[in-house]
Each structure stands twice: as C-alpha cells, then as structure tokens.
C-alpha cells in the first residue's frame, strides 16, 4: 500500500502553525507497515487542493487529507472534494444529526455557520467525530481512496485511530514492519555510515538510516516484509550485527534514553549520587529528578555558580580558586569531593566550565568544561572541549555527565 498525506491551511503553508498532524499520521502509517513516499501542504485554495489531490491520486492508493472542514469562509476542503469527485455538495443527514447531538451533549447552541460542516460530496461516506463538530468523510476517486479529516489535532487523532487506521489494517495490503533503534554518541554520521557498510547485505527487506538528535545520533534499522516470521528473523540478525559493531558506543536502544538507562543502573546497583553544578545551573539534577523514583538514589544537588558558593557550600579552598581559577581540573575535583563528603553519597559528580557566549580565553575557550567524579577510593577528572551556543554547551555537558555515570555504573560488579 502506498499512502500520501495532504495538509491544508494557509497557516501551515506560511509557517504560522507547526503541522503536528502530518508527523502523527506518518508515525501511525509507519507502524502499520504502510509505504509513505509523499507529503504535501497547500493553502486554502480550492483549485490548489483539487490539483494536489489529483497529483497524489496518481502516485498512491490512499490519501489522508487534514484541515479545512471548519465553519468559516476559508474552510473550503469539502468544496474542493466535491469538485474532485465531480459530485454535488449537499447536506449529509448523518453529519446534521451529529451537529444536533453535539450541541445537546455540550449544552451549547451552535452558530448557524456550523451548518456548513454538514455539507459533503454526495458520494462521500461519513467518518464520525466523537470529540468535535466537524465529521470527516471518505470517497474514492480515480482508484484512490481519500480520507478527509479536520485539522484540529485532538479530533484528527481520534478519527484516525477509530476509523481510518482500522480500515487500512483490514485491507490486508500493508506489509509487516519491524524496527530497531540504537542511540550512540561521540561519533559522526559519516563514521557511523562507514562502520555499518554492508550490515544489511543479503537482506533486501532491511534498510538503515541515521537521525541526528543533538547530542546523540539514532541508528534506525527497518525491515519491511510480507510475513511476520521473515521480518522477525531479519531484524534479529541485522540488529545483532549492528549492536556488535557499535559496541560500547550504544548507550540506549529503542524507547530508552540516557536518562532512563542511568536511572535503571542506579536502581540496579543501589548506588547513591550527589551533584555539584556550576555551568549547567542544575540541568543535570533536573534530568535526573524528571524521572519518578529518583529519590531512591539521588541525595542532593548543589548549584554553586559563584566562587563564594563553592567555598561556603562545598569547602573549595579560596586559595585554590585564586590560583587555578573556577574552571580548572583542581576545582572540579574539590567540588566533587566536597559534594560527596557533605551528602554521604557513593558517587558525586561535579561540573565547572564556560558555557558562553562570553568568558572564554585563548587558554580556556568557550566550551571548556571540567568534570570530576568522586567515589570511595578515588576522584577522577576529565576535560571536555564542546562546541555550540550556550544552550548546546550546557545540554551536551549534561549528556556527558550522565554518560560518564552510565559507564561507571556498568563497570560495577
């Protein structure tokens, strides 16, 4: 099955509103194993809508259209659909009954303009709307099946899940889809591509793609086959090959994140953590405490942004700050040791750096970050030289901190 998505609305075309409907539909179709080669966006113009529908009908056998079914003058999708189908636009009894029922349910008198939402091509079949006023409709034109849905996301999703997707699934014309995602960091797309050359060799049903989601890269393996057993077998083989090649670069798989992986490792090992943050301003602590249950292992987090805070709260010697500077290996280690002694945690991680845009120098440019990890037996420090704006430096620093904790916990017996 080849499907296409057509989004209608001047607000989408002009970039005033982000088209979340298209991404939602695309994800649902992907999971259903439907091939989606085309997406289009057109404005609120009848002829443009008709021509877009004709184009998509020639390249696909299913088109999902969203937007333009409202009660206002710029909602012209039903008119365009009638012109496309060569069918008169007329009041639909089922849609009229829905409008009446909706008004009674919400105890609200609808404006006469809402009657426009009952107008549909005579050849159309109604798609019920359980949460709004605008019913959708489906029709067949030139051998292609069209589904017209409202643009309001909550209404669109309900109708998509309740009516459209079941109809597509029951057609039996979709493939069996299997996918696997490996999340890696510290390596470029080009390097990944070179490493994984030939990983799908011998499996025509398998493909591999890369998606950058700073500061990580997702390696996506997709298998599309006619039979479930075939798809399961291929994804297992190609997935294992990919995992073995990438090795320790993989920090998470599928729906996991670095945050959830670290949380799971703390729970598994029983270790506890405290933090001392300067340049990240509490971002690492936020990422940890965003997950429920973090109180079981996260004891304390201090944002010691100023030198005075480092001295008063962490016991960093004033002389050390004067001699080495706040952004230094020595101060990072002193911060980590101070956090661990103060909290009594098993591990304490500290970060100090220059997030920018000011504050850098030739010796310590913007993006310079010192990170220290103190444990029972030793305190280690690392120097990072990150690139990007202030937000990116803080984000990648928090990621690097979590990744260090991940590696540390994995090494524990």
From Swiss-Prot:
User: What protein name does the entry list?
Assistant: CinA-like protein
Name the family the entry cites: Belongs to the CinA family.
Q: Which organism is it from?
A: Geotalea daltonii (strain DSM 22248 / JCM 15807 / FRC-32)
Alphabetical list of SMART domains matching this protein: MoCF_biosynth
Query: Which domain of life, per UniProt?
Result: Bacteria
Q: Return the NCBIfam families for the record.
A: cinA_nterm, PncC_domain, PRK00549.1
